[in-house]
């Protein structure tokens, strides 16, 4: 049965004889054409009918009050038509084979040659524009572009031929829809994109500004939208649960909101709430909704031409049932409702209601290709048969298309993929891995996939799609490349993928990084290996082949991706370690120009390489400090105060006015003594913890803030000149220098008692916390402080205990020292390049500056070398080590200070101390041992007895160390 109502038209549209058309009292006409109508395509000025056998008829319908309706005309086409869509005067037709035809106002049809090589699955028409969706997910638009309805960008002209809509490239589309002068696209995971005319808010974006490129309707995010229909100036959407949203023009009540006002954002049609609507359709100014379970059709909007089917010719702003013929309510089921122009249609059949009543998404037409188990199994089982040519074509269609891959492997359990966002991909990674594993069962199939990925897919990546669904391909591809690389032993595909990743716009790249953070270690670790292996290859190539400069760009891209993955691995508890990122080959690559390319990716450097990089500064100038021994700190600060930034970055030379000579010994002794002076309590620069082992900045400094700036410069000089100094700060200082916020753990290091107390507060039960009688008032650095200045005396409770602890840590580590720390930081970075410092983790930075206390004396002895008359079994050397082994730990540290100028071990360990021993020329047993600290050189008289050696060595260790203790 075929029902219709609305504009005055030829009886039965000419599908049946006039006497075969019946009419109800409510103005609904119905008839039973001999040839089954498969699809209806009403437009603003014509209606198309697709018959069950694929033949097409059209009839021209003039505007209301215009000329008489035309006659039904059959189109002479050799191809069988599956689908058609009509605009104001034109139509687009689609064959079962995916060929598309254009029908002009004279009903003449011609193939759309620009789409001849594409398998089209959906076509839609607005008043004067058209869209076509292909099987591999490409969207084309053409026609009038007066309001941006083609989505090609502002200022683009109208086009007579189809143009690719690149801004939606990669989005797996489920449906396309066109209104008067606006357009919509719906993704498989329910994202809604609109563009074009927005005069009444019909795009649902909260305003009335036209859009010239697709914009995501955020109000419909997570609503599980499965279908869209557009009127001339309004839009309706349907969710999977049967909820209807409408927006745009409400002038005729077509929104169904019990008002005639426009809505700029999607609003639920309240009268249909809970009815589980299964189909919706929009006419020019009216809307229909079908509740499949009750076979009830509701109408609302403009009724001037009787298009509401209620026997009235008045507008209606709330949904009311359409009075269908009795047969439609009893013996027949509603297959499809369609509205267009000022007409409404219903197709009924004798059969039981099929899925079209329950799942309105079937009304979209065919969907884009997806990669699934059946397809893969067929490829594997038939690839050695005469079907291989067909299989190759399918592989090309799927693996050359971002959209097809993005439509595959969705998490459909509990409709999870409808929650896709910039923080959730909606992708089932286990299914991805299983599918790739099956593909690898036939090398012939896998290699063909690799060929298409390399030739077609990878070069097309890097677009700036407007939706998160376009990013799934970047999670799928690594799984494919991982298997391909094992078979092919190549890296070029990974290089191309890295390049594509870095072409993504920043917001999309940030979303992808979020997706990575949600991956389990089983998927993240192979991802790290995928980019690490070619990175190491290029570094090795660069190390041993100076002609490999052409690969520097590839290397830079690869390590950039590695650095992003490193940050992901650090964000949670992972089995992935920092060692998984280190490229050990870089330790022998000391070419400045290449290392400069890698200076933003510290994850690939181990500590040894970082320290070597620090030594490789391209500095040719020196920064000279000329100091008086008696006014060391005063002279130092005076010269730092006036030094320019460029000069400070030179290699440090220290000269004493009393004895004008340049030696590295001067520099080491300078740092030793100047830091000793600054850290004495008498300097009043710092506060000490309870055990006097660590220092921190004061909340109320008694010295000028400039002192901390100069202290920062001094610390910067020590760092840049590879000098280990006494800097007993907690790790918090080094965290703050590299932009990492201190935590309760850092406060506990500074003040163990306080830190443990705060941890107890967090661990206490709610009842215990409420009984503590604590407030947000604390004492720090002998000063009372309200941690919540907006609420004096605020009580600590179970609900705010974390807030209290966080505020305590923030005050002690940040707020209380903000001014002095910022001065210190400013001074430090006046000397040091920030990107160099941030190469180091906080623990590494502290280790480089302060050294470690891992004293492995056996390594010192093992690495010692002997010169001139000395050798390992020389009696004096044997006595030396016997004496050394008998020294106390304090004396051994004093020996290290005497030998190197540092009393702590370099961060890389005792292996870095290369002790040399030679005889002291022209010496007697009365002479003390001497040391050249810049060379770790011990000059030792040839003492006749071990006893003499021991006495003289101990005397030397604690002898007054030079100039200022005369």
Over which residues does each language-model region extend?
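Surface loop/turn motifs at the tips and blade-to-blade linkers of beta-strand repeat domains
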Residues: 29-33, 73-77, 112-116, 121-122, ...
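C-terminal catalytic/scaffold cores in eukaryotic proteins
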Residues: 353, 365-368, 373-478, 482-499, ...
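Conserved beta-strand position repeated across blades of beta-propeller domains
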Residues: 41, 85, 93, 124, ...
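Blade-level signature of beta-propeller repeat domains, shared across WD40, Kelch, NHL, RCC1
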Residues: 296, 302, 313-369
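Short glycine/serine- and acidic-residue-enriched loop/turn motifs that recur at repeat junctions
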Residues: 2-39, 50, 57-77, 94, ...
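Hydrophobic, conserved cores of late-appearing folded domains
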Residues: 569-760, 820, 845, 923-925, ...
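Conserved core positions of repeat-based scaffolds
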Residues: 4, 46-49, 58, 90-93, ...
């Amino acid at each position: 049965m075929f029902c219709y109502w609305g504009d005055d038209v030829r009886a039965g549209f000419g599908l049946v004889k006039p006497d075969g058309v019946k009419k109800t009292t409510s103005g609904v006409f119905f008839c039973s054409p001999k040839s089954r109508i498969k699809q209806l395509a009403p437009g603003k000025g014509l209606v198309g009918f697709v018959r069950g056998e694929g033949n097409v008829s059209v009839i021209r319908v003039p505007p209301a009050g215009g000329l008489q309706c035309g006659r039904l005309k059959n189109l002479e086409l050799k191809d069988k038509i599956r689908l058609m869509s009509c605009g104001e005067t034109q139509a687009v037709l689609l064959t079962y084979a995916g060929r598309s035809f254009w029908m002009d106002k004279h009903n003449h049809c011609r193939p759309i040659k620009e789409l001849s090589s594409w398998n089209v699955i959906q076509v839609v028409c607005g008043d004067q524009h058209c869209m076509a969706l292909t099987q591999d997910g490409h969207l084309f638009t053409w026609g009038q572009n007066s309001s941006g309805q083609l989505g090609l960008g502002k200022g683009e002209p109208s086009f007579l031929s189809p143009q690719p809509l690149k801004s939606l490239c990669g989005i797996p589309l489920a449906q396309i829809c066109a209104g008067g002068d606006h357009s919509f696209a719906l993704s498989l995971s329910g994202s809604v994109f609109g563009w074009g005319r927005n005069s009444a808010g019909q795009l649902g974006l909260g305003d009335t500004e036209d859009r010239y490129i697709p914009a995501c309707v955020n109000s419909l995010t997570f609503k599980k939208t499965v279908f869209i229909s557009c009127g001339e100036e309004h839009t309706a959407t349907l969710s999977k649960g049967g909820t209807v949203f409408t927006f745009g023009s409400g002038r005729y009540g077509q929104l169904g909101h019990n008002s005639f006002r426009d809505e700029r954002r999607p609003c639920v049609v309240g009268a249909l709430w809970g009815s589980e609507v299964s189909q919706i359709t929009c006419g020019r100014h009216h809307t229909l909704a079908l509740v499949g379970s009750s076979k009830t059709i509701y109408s609302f909007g403009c009724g001037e031409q009787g298009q509401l089917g209620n026997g009235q010719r008045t507008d209606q702003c709330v949904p009311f049932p359409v009075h269908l013929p009795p047969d439609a309510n009893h013996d027949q089921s509603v297959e499809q409702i369609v509205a267009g122009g000022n007409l409404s249609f219903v197709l009924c059949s004798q059969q039981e209601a099929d899925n079209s009543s329950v799942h309105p998404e079937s009304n979209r037409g065919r969907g884009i290709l997806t990669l699934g188990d059946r397809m893969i199994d067929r490829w594997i089982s038939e690839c050695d048969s005469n079907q291989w040519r067909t299989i190759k074509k399918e592989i090309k269609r799927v693996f050359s298309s971002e959209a097809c891959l993005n439509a595959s492997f969705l998490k459909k359990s509990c409709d999870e993929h409808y929650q896709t966002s910039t923080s959730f991909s909606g992708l089932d990674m286990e299914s991805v891995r299983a599918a790739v594993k099956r593909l690898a069962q036939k090398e012939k199939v896998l290699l063909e996939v690799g060929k298409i990925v390399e030739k077609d897919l990878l070069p097309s990546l890097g677009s700036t799609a407007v939706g998160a669904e376009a990013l799934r391909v970047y999670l799928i591809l690594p799984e494919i490349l991982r298997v391909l690389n094992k078979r092919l032993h190549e890296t070029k595909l990974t290089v191309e993928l890295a390049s594509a990743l870095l072409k993504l716009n920043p917001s999309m790249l940030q979303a992808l990084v979020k997706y990575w953070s949600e991956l389990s270690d089983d998927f993240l670790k192979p991802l790290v290996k995928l980019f690490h292996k070619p990175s190491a290859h290029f570094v090795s190539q660069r190390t041993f082949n100076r002609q490999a400069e052409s690969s520097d760009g590839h290397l830079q891209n690869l390590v950039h991706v590695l650095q992003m993955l490193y940050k992901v691995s650090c964000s949670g508890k992972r089995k992935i370690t920092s060692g998984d990122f280190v490229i050990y080959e870089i330790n022998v690559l000391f070419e400045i120009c290449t290392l400069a390319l890698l200076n933003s990716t510290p994850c690939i450097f181990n500590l040894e390489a970082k320290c070597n990089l620090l030594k490789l500064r391209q500095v040719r100038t020196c920064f000279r400090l000329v100091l008086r021994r008696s006014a060391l700190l005063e002279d130092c600060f005076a010269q730092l105060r006036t030094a320019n930034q460029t000069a400070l970055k030179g290699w440090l030379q220290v000269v004493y006015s009393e004895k004008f000579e340049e030696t590295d010994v001067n520099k080491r002794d300078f740092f030793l003594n100047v830091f000793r002076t600054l850290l004495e309590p008498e300097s009043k620069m710092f506060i000490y913890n309870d055990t006097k082992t660590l220092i921190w900045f004061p909340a109320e400094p008694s010295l000028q803030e400039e002192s901390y700036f100069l202290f920062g410069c001094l610390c910067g000089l020590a760092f840049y000149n590879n000098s280990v100094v006494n800097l007993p700060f907690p790790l918090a200082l080094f965290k703050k220098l590299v932009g990492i916020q201190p935590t309760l753990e850092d406060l506990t290091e500074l003040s163990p008692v306080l830190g443990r107390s705060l941890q107890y507060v967090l661990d206490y039960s709610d009842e215990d916390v409420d009984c503590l009688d604590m407030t947000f008032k604390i004492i720090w650095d002998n000063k009372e402080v309200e941690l919540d200045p907006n609420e004096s005396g605020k009580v600590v409770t179970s609900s705010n205990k974390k807030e209290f602890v966080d505020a305590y840590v923030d005050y002690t580590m940040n707020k209380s020292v903000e001014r002095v720390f910022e001065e210190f930081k400013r001074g430090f970075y006046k000397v040091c390049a920030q990107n160099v410092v941030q190469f180091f983790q906080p623990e590494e930075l502290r280790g480089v500056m302060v050294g470690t206390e891992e004293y492995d004396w056996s390594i010192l002895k093992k690495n010692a070398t002997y010169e001139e008359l000395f050798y390992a079994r020389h009696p004096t050397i044997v006595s030396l080590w016997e004496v050394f082994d008998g020294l106390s730990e304090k004396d051994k540290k004093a020996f290290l200070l005497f030998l190197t100028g540092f009393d702590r071990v370099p961060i890389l360990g005792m292996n870095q101390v290369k002790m040399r021993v030679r005889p002291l020329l022209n010496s007697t047993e009365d002479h003390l041992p001497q040391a050249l600290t810049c060379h770790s050189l011990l000059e030792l008289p040839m003492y006749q007895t071990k006893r003499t050696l021991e006495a003289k060595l101990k005397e030397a260790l604690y002898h007054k160390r030079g100039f200022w203790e005369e």
